[in-house]
Amino acid sequence: MAQIPPSLQDLVNRFNQAQAQLQSVLLRKQQYEAELKEVEKALAEIEKLPQDAKIYKSVGNFLIPQTKDAALQELKERKELLELHAKTLTRQESMLREQIDKLRDEINKELGKLRGGAQEAAKGGS
C-alpha cells in the first residue's frame, strides 16, 4: 500500500480545518439569527404598547424599570449589531465554501495523479 504524499496530506488537513471553521461559522450565524428573531418579536410587542406602559429590563437577577423609548432604542441598537454580525458571518461562510471547493478540486486532482501513477506501476510490473 502506497503512502499518502505529504502534499496530499497537507491538502486534506487544510480541507478538514476549513470544514470545521465552516461548521463553527454556521453555528454562530444560526445563534445570531435566532437572537435577531427574538429582538424583532420584542420590538414588535413593545411598539404596540402605550407610551406610558411599564417596561422592565432583566439585569442579572433583577428587573429594572425602563421607558418605552429607552427599550425601543436599546432593542434597535441590538438588532443593528446582530444584523451586522450575521452579515459578516455570511461573508465568512461564502469565503470558506469557496476555499473548501478549491481544496476539494486540488485533492481530487492529486488523487487522480496518484491513481494514474499506480496504474502505470501496475502495468509496468506485469
From Swiss-Prot:
Protein species of origin? Pyrobaculum neutrophilum (strain DSM 2338 / JCM 9278 / NBRC 100436 / V24Sta)
Enumerate the HAMAP family for this protein: PfdB (MF_00307)
The record's annotation in CDD domains points to:
Prefoldin_beta_GimC
Q: What is its main location?
A: cytoplasm
Please state what the protein is called: Prefoldin subunit beta
Extract the GO molecular function terms from the UniProt entry.
protein-folding chaperone binding; unfolded protein binding
| Cellular localisation | Cytoplasm
Task: Specify one Pfam family.
Answer: Prefoldin_2
**Purpose of the protein:** Molecular chaperone capable of stabilizing a range of proteins. Seems to fulfill an ATP-independent, HSP70-like function in archaeal de novo protein folding.
Q: How does it assemble?
A: Heterohexamer of two alpha and four beta subunits.
Its domain of life reads Archaea
- Look up the record and report any one GO term of the cellular component aspect: cytoplasm
